[in-house]
Regions:
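Short linker/helix segments within small regulatory modules
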Residues: 110, 134-139
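Short metal-coordination and nucleic-acid-contact micro-motifs, chiefly zinc-binding Cys/His arrays
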Residues: 69, 114-117, 140
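N-terminal secretory signal peptides and thylakoid transit peptides that target proteins
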Residues: 1-18
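Short Fe-S-cluster ligation motifs
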Residues: 102-119
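Short Cys/His-rich local motifs and their 1-3 flanking residues in nucleic-acid-associated proteins
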Residues: 78, 123-126
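Short cysteine-rich clusters marking metal-coordination/redox-active sites
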Residues: 73, 121-124
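C-terminal segment of N-terminal export signals and the immediately downstream linker at the start
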Residues: 24-51, 55-56
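Mid-length scaffold segments of soluble, non-membrane domains
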Residues: 66-95
Length: 140
């Protein structure tokens, strides 16, 4: 099929396509609904949850947490992980072999020139981290 485009229209379409491609991940990131701001969140928690920040490794209070029970979203209180799913990945971040069913929604994160899976609380939409294939071999 042949299109009869003048030079100006072609350049406009090319520009729209080019810039839309680079802006698309940022638009999608802003489209995630984030709600129920817990007034007791720390500055660090807000940066991670609402700006997709990352805490420094080996700084989380949850890294050495050993109590039985559940890990909850600090923003809305939704249950996210069972303590039985926690393992030491050696990365310096709390790691889990699996989340509770329906606890998260995921999206692809292309920041820093990498393709990663980012996960957000299914209830309030805040960012909680990334999914990596670093779990114990028996969990797949």
């Amino acid at each position: 099929m042949k299109y009869n485009l003048d030079k100006r229209t072609f350049i406009k379409l090319l520009g729209i396509t080019f810039f839309s491609f680079f802006l698309m991940p940022f638009k999608f990131a802003k489209a995630v609904t984030k709600k129920v701001v817990n007034e007791n969140l720390t500055k660090k928690q807000k940066e991670i949850m609402f700006n997709e920040g990352t805490e420094r490794p080996f700084t989380s209070d949850l890294l050495n947490e050993k109590r039985e029970g559940f890990y909850h979203c600090a923003n809305c209180g939704a249950k996210l992980f069972a303590s039985t799913a926690k393992f030491d990945s050696g990365t310096g971040w709390p790691s889990f072999t699996e989340a509770l069913p329906g606890a998260f929604k995921t999206k692809i994160d292309y920041s820093f020139g990498m393709k990663r899976i980012e996960y957000h609380c299914a209830n309030c939409g805040v960012h909680h981290g990334h999914v990596f294939a670093d779990g114990p071999s028996e969990t797949g």
